[in-house]
Swiss-Prot record:
<dbReference type="GO" id="GO:0000785">
    <property type="term" value="C:chromatin"/>
</dbReference>
<dbReference type="Pfam" id="PF10345">
    <property type="entry name" value="Cohesin_load"/>
</dbReference>
<comment type="subunit">
    <text>Interacts with Nipped-B to form the cohesin loading complex.</text>
</comment>
<comment type="function">
    <text>Required for association of the cohesin complex with chromatin during interphase. Plays a role in sister chromatid cohesion and normal progression through prometaphase.</text>
</comment>
<feature type="repeat" description="TPR 1">
    <location>
        <begin position="455"/>
        <end position="488"/>
    </location>
</feature>
<comment type="similarity">
    <text>Belongs to the SCC4/mau-2 family.</text>
</comment>
<dbReference type="GO" id="GO:0051301">
    <property type="term" value="P:cell division"/>
</dbReference>
<keyword id="KW-0159">Chromosome partition</keyword>
<protein>
    <recommendedName>
        <fullName>MAU2 chromatid cohesion factor homolog</fullName>
    </recommendedName>
</protein>
<keyword id="KW-0498">Mitosis</keyword>
<keyword id="KW-0802">TPR repeat</keyword>
<dbReference type="GO" id="GO:0005634">
    <property type="term" value="C:nucleus"/>
</dbReference>
<feature type="repeat" description="TPR 2">
    <location>
        <begin position="495"/>
        <end position="528"/>
    </location>
</feature>
<keyword id="KW-0132">Cell division</keyword>
<dbReference type="GO" id="GO:0032116">
    <property type="term" value="C:SMC loading complex"/>
</dbReference>
<keyword id="KW-0131">Cell cycle</keyword>
<dbReference type="GO" id="GO:0005654">
    <property type="term" value="C:nucleoplasm"/>
</dbReference>
């Protein structure tokens, strides 16, 4: 008799737990949810002095509810800390223990200026999870992402290498490839070119030969191809990348087909396969992004604009479903790219509106501090290009100097310095010009930079030689630029070099060679279209036709020159009247809030007299550390432009939960 009677209290208590949990879930899932009553039901569980495991689980559930449905972060933290203190030493309680650690780390990141507490929590959890492959790998990914966000790339890379080894020991091939590709992404941001190639080759062979599930294989292929495309773009290899980009576009179409299974179906059956880099809808936007980057670098501004508008439309659709932070990252990078397109085409007024739109996205994003911090240097660079193209050289110089001081990205720094060199050239500051060219030359003899940026460097040297009337030296530099540009189909760099070479030949009285240079320059400029090269080229053509006494063609060239000039002057007038023009005075802190006409993307570009053209740097890389997503931009300018910035960092940094960037 004593047996049944002693068991009854325990059975009765279990029934109470179950009833209260059921009620809590009922209130949580009601329409609308009744979170207050849900929390009251969970709190009532503690009155029964439950066993340790029940108490820890209930504290975890309270923390989850408070984080998801309320702003009571302090109470959420208290419950999660209690759950961790109870569960840390309990055996066979991994889900509660490590879920709590993961959530506490997230909460520390949200509420504390430093990530140290989050890292310490995850390091302890990683140490305790070594016998649970799923949680060990999940926590390694989370910790590596925090290190990557803090630009501690070596630490992130080491953690990802540990994850790859753990996955291999567990026979989890799919997960191992995710770790390898995530590590390749980090190494790409570090510009460890040889290591990136080795990892990509290793991962590519495994994808081809050791992934039996066709859907997982295609998904990994998209991740692999995104990194491969970004790798080539970061090196300015626009022509070399074309086959990989085409493959990527075909793969994403396969994944987005109506008959393709849902991500839950593909990744939901095996715990060690429940990891994805990005869901397919976000991958779709990312492929648009790298396509935009490629179009910009290749000098196809119309294509870049078209794909940007499609990508932005897709982002808005996804935001209506769920406003994920990565969508804000993608949007900022796309706006940075489209700004470059507008300036090349002579529509600076729309460019400054889009810079303001990018600022608004940074300020409105939930991860405001990190997003603005990550894109501040790019925004200063873009504003510098805008100020340069509207002849506000003092403002442009200060913007580029701020960019150089804020960024740790070598290519962005080089890009800003090249534009500074052009400003010093235009304003006849020979000492400053020599100093910056010497510094750029010294630094880049020891490092391998993007083909596009190095071509831009030779172009600036050619422009400098031209202004010194050192025409032989100018030809030497410009031929080097043309060799690099032609090798990789860098059309804008080609057109700028050709028009400057034409001017060189015109200056030494060789009208035949001048015509041979300016004709293809104008054809390319029309195809891009680049109004600055068209303005310059039409002036050269007018002089050439006057010299050959061809009055009709001289008249046509003059009419074209007037048309381009008037378009740019009209646009200049709109720029200085725009409230967003005030952004040229932003040099520190948060960017000022300006008001103006709302941004509507499809706008016919207009066109500056005697323009200073932006140079256009190289890359667009999109990276991500394992299961999340991060972001980047290129740029440049001169009395004719050559480079461009917009994501002077690869979209490789745009995909890791929130980390990275590039353009």
């Amino acid at each position: 008799m004593s047996g049944p009677s002693s068991a009854n209290p325990a059975a009765s208590q279990d029934a109470c737990y179950i009833s209260l949990l059921g009620l809590a879930e009922y209130f949580r899932t009601s329409q609308p949810p009744n979170i207050k009553k849900c929390i009251q039901c969970l709190q009532a569980l503690f009155t029964f002095t439950p066993p340790s495991k029940v108490e820890a689980r209930t504290h975890l559930q309270m923390g989850q509810i408070l984080m998801a449905y309320t702003r009571n972060i302090d109470m959420a933290r208290q419950h999660l800390e209690k759950a961790w203190n109870i569960s840390e030493s309990l055996m066979n309680f991994d889900d509660v223990k490590f879920d709590t650690a993961s959530l506490l780390a997230q909460l520390h990141l949200q509420t504390e200026p430093s990530s140290n507490a989050a890292k310490a929590m995850l390091r302890r959890a990683v140490e305790l999870s070594q016998n649970n492959v799923y949680w060990h790998c999940k926590l390694l990914l989370q910790l590596s992402q925090i290190h990557a966000s803090d630009r501690e790339y070596s630490s992130a890379s080491e953690l990802l290498a540990v994850g790859a080894d753990s996955a291999e020991e567990a026979g989890a091939t799919y997960l191992k490839v995710l770790f390898l590709l995530s590590r390749a992404m980090i190494l790409m941001i570090e510009r460890k070119t040889n290591d990136v190639l080795a990892l990509l080759n290793s991962a590519g062979q495994i994808i081809d030969n050791n992934i039996p599930n066709p859907h997982q294989k295609e998904y990994l292929k998209v991740f692999f191809l995104v990194l491969q495309v970004c790798y080539y773009l970061a090196l300015g290899q626009v022509k070399t990348v074309k086959p990989s980009l085409k493959q990527l576009q075909m793969s994403i179409q396969t994944i987005m087909a109506p008959n393709w299974p849902s991500d839950d179906t593909i990744f939901g059956s095996n715990q060690l396969e429940m990891f994805v880099w990005l869901p397919k809808e976000q991958l779709y936007v990312l492929v648009y992004l790298v396509t935009v980057s490629h179009s910009m670098m290749a000098g196809y501004m119309d294509k870049a604009q078209k794909y940007t508008e499609k990508a932005l439309t897709q982002i808005e659709k996804l935001k209506l479903q769920e406003d994920k932070p990565i969508l804000s990252v993608f949007k900022v990078i796309l706006l940075e790219h489209i700004v470059m397109c507008r300036m090349v085409m002579g529509n600076r007024e729309l460019a400054i509106r889009e810079i303001a739109a990018a600022r608004d996205v940074c300020l409105a994003a939930p991860q405001r501090r990190s997003l603005l911090k990550r894109h501040s240097a790019q925004l200063h660079c873009l504003i510098g290009l805008y100020a340069m193209s509207t002849s506000f050289f003092d403002h442009a110089e200060r913007q580029f100097l701020v960019c150089v001081s804020e960024t740790t990205e070598r290519d962005l720094k080089l890009f800003a310095n090249l534009n500074l060199a052009i400003i010093y050239l235009r304003t006849k500051r020979e000492t400053d010009l020599k100093q910056i060219l010497d510094a750029v030359s010294t630094e880049n003899t020891h490092t391998y930079s993007s083909q596009a940026l190095m071509g831009g460097f030779y172009y600036v040297q050619g422009l400098h030689a031209f202004h010194k009337n050192s025409f032989h030296e100018a030809k030497r530099f410009l031929r080097e630029t043309l060799k690099m540009a032609n090798a990789e189909d860098l059309n804008r760099l080609t057109s700028c070099s050709l028009v400057l070479l034409s001017h060189v030949f015109l200056s030494i009285g060789n009208s035949k060679e001048s015509m041979n240079m300016v004709t293809p320059a104008m054809q390319l400029a029309s195809k891009i279209p680049d109004i600055h090269v068209q303005l310059w080229g039409s002036a050269i053509l007018k002089d050439l036709h006057r010299m050959s006494k061809d009055a009709q063609h001289e008249k046509e060239a003059y009419a074209n020159h007037v048309k381009y000039s008037e378009n740019l002057i009209a646009d200049q007038r709109k720029c200085v009247q725009s409230s967003h023009h005030e952004l040229v005075n932003w040099f520190h802190g948060d960017p000022p809030i300006t008001t103006g006409a709302p941004l509507t993307l499809p706008v016919i570009p207009e066109a500056i007299n005697n323009p200073v053209t932006p140079l256009t740097p190289s890359s667009a890389a999109v990276a991500a550390t394992a299961g999340a997503a991060a972001s980047t931009t290129p740029m440049t300018q001169t009395n004719v432009a050559v480079a461009s910035t917009s994501a002077l960092q690869p979209p490789v940094g745009a995909v890791a939960g929130q980390f990275g960037q590039f353009y």
